[in-house]
Amino acid sequence: MFFKRSTNSRKTSANSSSDTSTSSESLLLPLLNNTKAGARSQKGSVHRQSGKKARRKMMENPYVCSLELDELSADDSIIDYSVFSDDSFLLILLLTSKGDVQAYLETSRDTKPRKNVVNIKTACSLNVSPVTVCIGSQAAFAIFGLADGNLLVTPIRLLIDVTWGGSSWATTTVIDLSLPTVDPCLATPTCTKCFVSNFPPCTMAVVANKAGNILLVDLHLRKCVSELKAPQSLHQIDILLDENSIELLVTGFTGAQWIIPIERSGKGFREVLTTCVPSDLTVLEPATMQFFAADSCGVVALDTTESIVEVYNTFHSLAHSSKRTFKVPPETWMVHAGDNMLFTVSNDNEIRSALHFGFMSSRLEYTLVRTSTNWRPLGIVAMPSRPHKLAGIFVVNERGLVRVEQSTALNLTKIASEFFFRLSPLQLNSKSVAQVANACRIDTAEFQSALIPNLLSTRKNRQLTNKELSQIYSIAKAINLSMSDLLKAFENESIGEQLLPEVLNTIQTNPAKHDNLMQRVVEMFVKRSLSAEGNMDKIREYDAELSNFLARHEHLHKGSVDCAKAGMWKCTQTLVRRDVHETKSIDTSTEVLLYIIKNRLQIWNEANSTDRLQIMSLVCHLDWSKLADADGARVCAILSAWQRDISLPSYHEMCLRIAITNSDRFPRPCQILSLVSSIHILSEKKISNHANLPNFLPLAGGNNCGATITEDDRLMIWGNFTNAQQRMEMPQMNAKSKRSDSVTNGAPTLPPPAPKPEQHLPRVLEYPGGRPRAIACGAEHILVLSSSGQLSAWGGNRFGQCGVGHSFRIANLHQVDGDWPAIEKIACGQFHSAFICSDGSLWTFGWGVWGQLGHGGRNNSNQLVPTRVNGLICKVTQIACGRAHTVVLTDTGRVLVCGSGSYGQMGVDDDIKKVFAFTPLPLGPLRVRDIATHYYHSICITEDNRVFEWGRNPQELKMRMFVMKKIRSAQLKNTEDPSSPSPSTNGSTPRVNLNLPAEIPREDLGLREVKHFLDGNIVSVACGLSHSALITSEGTLYTWGKGLDYQLGHGNKNERMEPHQVFEPNGAKWVNVSLGNNHTIASTDDGSVFAWGKNDFGQCGVLTKKNGNSADVTKKFFFQARDGRRFMPNVDESQFVQKPGLIPDVRVRNLNEDGNEGVDKEEIVDRLKASDVNVVQAVSKHLYSPIEGKCNGSIIEDEPRNGKIQKQNKYDGEDGPLCTTTALVHLIAGDVKRAIRMIEWLKTDSSTCEKSLMVLSSLVWEVMANHEDVQSREALSAAFRHVPMSDSMRKGKQIAQLWPAVWNDERVQSSLSIDEKIAMLDGFTSASKPVSCPTIPSSSLEVSSKIRVYAQCAHAEPAAVGSPPECSTCLDEWTEKVRHTLGTQL
């Protein structure tokens, strides 16, 4: 069926199948506007109407258009049409303005449609002018409304060659319908319809004309049998049929509509019309909605204002709400509803279609039908249904007939799959699958099996969005497709890695059930990384994600080689270590090593600084025992070369250790690696003097734990590294929860077994990162900083406080790598961390919900990796982290704070909840030199030794409020007591002062000074939960604050408002102090460590035994709270260490023990001298970067560029580490030029020892003087310009002998003073000439009996008293050279 709203187009009803349409939810509706898809071609041509934007976002329209009838002349047009159809038959008659009839017939027996054109005047031999057409009953005849108001009945055989048509309709007949009361010009028919009456059965025709007359014509009697009069000219009549009634839906030219009964309840039309009064007929409402007839007695209503279509099952249901509503594009004026789709026509004559397959929703996804024409449609005719095809339509327009059918390039199953993909998640179920399959008349099982492959095949060449992946996964669940099978379907299309998010979600819901998918996750991450095609940022992102996954599933151990090939080095290291542990084999380790050896250049060049550290660490930690000699030598060479690009000493130390470990198997390569690593360490050692070492922090206390750096450089920890504490319990809730667990799980859930007390005693934490320098504790985690500046983390990590890129617990100390300057100081809050770098920058990470990370704006997200704090004007010199706030000290002596201010942490009395950026503490002109915080309150020490604190423990504030409320209640009770004294004589009642705060008082939360009488300057300060401590320059320890847990060390529970000295042990000189929740840890100058306070988790490092009279079961006391009955354990005194107690077997390292570390320089020099020349040459090559076309960062050049010498301002390390040992290596290796360049930079380095430089310089001059193979003009010029000379060297003959070779070099002359030039001239002796036998001239023998023969030049001359010792010939030659070279400079 079709319906439209129009006042200027003729139309007839078209027969079609019944409407059972519902709709699917529209995902996109971008074409519901006035924008046209493209430029129009000339009128009448077929063109493409599909926008690029629509094709990209919406489902591809499955329909295409083709012309079927377009045989009219230019001045002819279609004015009316009629249709007759059933399941295998379709007949369409088109009436033209010239009286021609175009017939179009399709049957199931015909291979192609039959067409015919007949002129009515010619065929009937009558002078008639047909204006309407209607196909009669059983398609046996056709009825034409004539311009004069009469009807023409012709047999169908007259219009097209068919075999049917009864004898009753064998002749052409004109039925006279002339009405004497109607003007002839108004008698012209506007609509003609045919139906078969029920009472009695009779073939009838209905004719409407311009005068508003409705004529019922008995076609057997050939006459009008009834006449009705409408109040206006009629435009359209639709016939509404059901088993017991026939009604007319009449539409006037104004759009007003009425329903006129013809037959009802078994009564014929004569009886019904007799009782029908036209004035009683009611106009259908609303006026904005146009109603049309549909098949099966249905009615369809189009509301162009709201752009909706309402479908009613029968015309009797118009008064009820049983309807289905569909959204249509704006400006729609014609719609055709089929079983599975809707077609719409807009005012611009654009044809759109939307599939619904029986699903109802308020929106559909409409797309343009390709290659539709721009002729104005008159109506839409449904095609007969065909197997495996969507139902098509014919569009009747002013020029003829256009076929719209499913494209042959598309498969119905794929079309249905795409539609099913666009259903809402709530509609995705097995019933929906069956509904779509039945609507398409395909097998449900076949459709279900092809659903996912069809969707993936059309998307295999692009990246699926998260929404698409989620929808496909929902479909898989609807058809009961397992994740394994779904993954196979994805892999068949080579897009398996795109399912990764859904696979991860599936595993997370039930890891045990989906264990078989976990290894596939590794494979998918590898494929993702390989598909990144060198995008290292993406690969690192995938590496981090997979690392998070592996942290949760520690049993996975396969795939390390694939991860290495994909460039995911963090996961490679994790999987290799696990594989060795699981399989007890190192084959995987060897395979990874061989891959790195083979692809070393590509791997290193593609890696950034962080990746390089990871790769080097991986190579050093892999097992080399199965490497061949050649491969072992290559690995050593790789590590030797890679160290040029690494500046962290811990990695050089790592290479040195691996060289020592494998020296027996690979002696020569490991010797080279050892020397290279040692030289790098020496260079860093030269730079990292005591002034540049990280801040020394050997002692740390956490929530219920402690940690220290021992005197033998081990890490010792004790206590419980969790946030556990004694909590109040509610018996009713606990019992209820246990019952709930028993019901749901079948057995009560038992709490995890408590750790044994012995497990809380001091224990070693393995630390492979070199020599630890500083340690800090949070509630659940530890940070460790080595002397070389390498940061490591261990422990709880649920907020990212370990800074390793994920939020899972770190089972072993894990290096925190990143691109930041050298770290100098570290600090841990309860769940966040921070460190300060050498450039004064601040980096924070971990819990950030209160703004305690200080990143400004409204940034309260957790940071999983260290992130720099921007916006700080001054350099940061100290850092302290509390529970939810952070305090820093700048180089100007100012204190900055950020984070939570609920309990005064911001240093003001105002109620400040959160501060996201660092703000100054209101201290005025006072300069601060030390800060401390760990929980809620903070302390700062000014330069004049004053102590200020701010903030309060919330438990303390709540207790204060509790007392105040009790006082208020007592006062109120006293004022209301009847037994109170009688009113005063003046009638007024005495009032009690009730001026008590209703909320937490804040006047004591801000900055306040702590008065003290200390015996020296404060050198250290620390904060706990409710207590504080400091150490003076005299080694005296003072504590103050709450003492309920004996945390003050005074042997009692008294609270101290100002610092009080800790007297035990006697004579102790305190060096370090750190505070935990309710315990204190401190160390003395002899390395002893003491602890006292709360010890329920062994945080004091010892076991405390219960008193003899204590019951085995801890006693509890109950109290009635507002939200129910609660109880708390009655803690006995055995859970405390009441006075400072020594922690056995723990001795802390003190600062004075932090001497020189690393390799010994003299030892390295001796090893170099004893090494083979080839070894030293190999070491030399590994120390410098072989960059072609560069002068390696030196000012030495063969020739000046553009007449000027190019000079770099800073050494870039291309000749190797900047130290004298590097220059010595180059010198021994014979690379004198490089050694001289190194000396050039060493002269400008303030950390270079002058004595070592002069010794090195003398060696250079010695080599230059004694080895002619290095005496090139370039090398000599460089040496005279840059190598220092002592006075003795300058006056010596060796240097004077070399100078003449370069004395005409302007650069050499400009670098020497006149005195230096004269000194070398004075020390000059002519070069010796090798003479085996001197020749004596005969003239010399004749003149004198004595001659002098010069061995240096073999000249002979008479000996004379007072003659100079030099050869006169050579002297003249030398003088001439000097004069020629120096001119008048002397």
Curated annotation (Swiss-Prot):
Cystine pairs: none
Chain's role: Could be a guanine-nucleotide releasing factor for glo-1. May play a role in gut granule biogenesis. Regulates axon termination in PLM and ALM neurons.
Annotated RCC1 repeat ranges: 737-787, 788-838, 839-891, 893-943, 1034-1085, 1087-1139
Region span, Disordered: 1-25, 37-56, 730-760, 972-994
Protein name: X-linked retinitis pigmentosa GTPase regulator homolog
Changes seen on gene knockout: Worms exhibit lack of intestinal gut granules.
UniProt-recorded Gene Ontology molecular function terms: guanyl-nucleotide exchange factor activity; ubiquitin protein ligase activity
Ranges of Basic residues composition bias in the record: 45-56
Keywords noted in UniProt: Guanine-nucleotide releasing factor, Repeat
Keyword Repeat on entry: yes
Gene Ontology CC entries for this record: axon; cytoplasm; synapse
Keyword 4Fe-4S: no
Species of the source: Caenorhabditis elegans
Superkingdom per UniProt: Eukaryota
GO biological process, one term: ubiquitin-dependent protein catabolic process
Comp. bias regions, Low complexity: 9-25
